[in-house]
Amino acid sequence: STRKESSAASDVYKRQVFNIEQYISREFGRRIGTKEEEAFFIGDGKGKPTGIFNATGGAETGVTSTGTSITFDDVMDLYYSLRAPYRNKAVWLLNDSTVKAIRKLKDGNGNYIWQPSVREGEPDKILNRPYRTSIYVPELAAGNRVMAFGDYSYYWIADRQGRSFKRLNELYATTGQVGFLASERVDGKLILSEAVKTLDIKAAGK
């Protein structure tokens, strides 16, 4: 569950020249969405969703690198570690640090495996499949699960309680403020672990 609380001076609230309640509601929504993104990727399942990259209950390991960096073979092996039926809708998930490394990789013919979009509105691709980035995907470093490839329709999200936004008039009355409380209860878990595979970087010293 996610819970956020804030307050504003009551005189500012009364003399507002713009809709401060609407602004706070949007800001709460943005922050709650950010926390949900984090949990859906790396949550440990203890009072929060089980993230795709969590070692327990998350995606299956498709490939473990032979070194502490990423290679063309690692990316190709990850692609084919995912069964063909799931590859039809598969998307890559990675951090910007991994994107940077992959953009430098070439195949055996010296061609970059990164495929820049040639049409407006279409994403760049890796091995002909689109990718998405998030700051919550683990960075490219030894011992991390740094990249996922799969069909994320098998990651189920349950809204246990719809998002609520309340104005608390009494709670901060003695301080001349107006309070706001936003909350939402959600859960998430990959129900079919074989639908998403990860690339794990070899731990240092192993």
Model-derived features: positions:
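Single conserved hydrophobic/aromatic residue that forms the stacking wall/gate
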Residues: 1-9, 13
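Structured, hydrophobic secondary-structure cores that serve as assembly/anchoring elements
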Residues: 10-206
